[in-house]
Amino acid sequence: MKKSLTSLDLNLLLCLQLLMQERSVTKAAKRMNVTPSAVSKSLAKLRAWFDDPLFVNTPLGLVPTPLMVSMEQSLADWMQMGNQLLDKPHHQTPRGLKFELAAESPLMMIMFNSLSQQIYQRYPQATIKVRNWDYDSLEAITRGEVDIGFTGRESHPRSRELLSLLPLAIDFEVLFSDLPWVWLREDHPALREAWDLDTFLRYPHISICWEQSDTWALDDVLQEMGRKRHIALSLPGFEQSLFMAAQPGHTLIATAPRYCQHYNQLHQLPLVARPLPFDAQQREKLMVPFTLLWHKRNSHNPKIVWLRQAINTLCRRLI
């Protein structure tokens, strides 16, 4: 028999979402500012309502049942719509409005000063939270923890980061496309040699750990050629790799998007750029579409629409 929503305490759905996010009764209780016992009692009520265990206890934490997994997206959508409904008054008087962004650095560092000024000019009492883009950022957008993401995707046909492979719930807009370049210290010995593939591969490389991987489309292209680069150092992001490439006493080289020239100028890094020594077809596989990403439920959210427009305008002016 179909159950009536009026007989369900809606606070239980918030508890259910937090349990799905945390996979722990204790952590969910901490986020709700209640005792673990209270969360356990709520979970018992939810199990009775859905006639399903919902979660199974394991040494690694709570593991959702197939029914719980099937409900995850609908639950996140429902909670997000509830938050938007409660935020309606803030569209007229935007006190306490929050902006949650996940962005690739140094891209955000180039534009953040201008973007934050625009946000505070329009919403003087807004708060802004920026996190680095990482392997969990798409899930954070889906869960409603991030309003909008700004990052590069890949173009190589074998890449896991193709725009065509984004989850169906994610909308996106490509703001610009960029080709990675090679960045070397001004006195790097490679600059005294003919710039070709052999020179490029002769020296140790700095790579970045992207989406929990130390390799990317560049390494796929090299593999197709029967070649491989020596990755001597892996770092969390482009800004760290550029900083290290600029330091004396080593022959490391970095590969980073061409837009990083703006970052280098801003921080006066003594770096010289060289194009990747590949043909046009190979370079096409390395093209990086820099993309805004948001959840479909936010496509008409006034705050998100305004933020997208602001970032779009800044990109055209700064990049």
From Swiss-Prot:
Pfam families found in the cross-reference section: HTH_1, LysR_substrate
UniProt xrefs under NCBIfam families: PRK10216.1
Keyword Ligase: no
Protein name: HTH-type transcriptional regulator YidZ
Organism for this UniProt entry: Salmonella paratyphi A (strain ATCC 9150 / SARB42)
Xref: SUPFAM superfamilies: Periplasmic binding protein-like II, Winged helix' DNA-binding domain
Domain HTH lysR-type: 8-65
Keyword Transcription regulation among UniProt keywords: yes
Function: Involved in anaerobic NO protection.
GO MF terms held by the record: DNA binding; DNA-binding transcription factor activity
Assigned keywords, A-Z: DNA-binding, Transcription, Transcription regulation
Residue range(s) of DNA binding per entry: 25-44
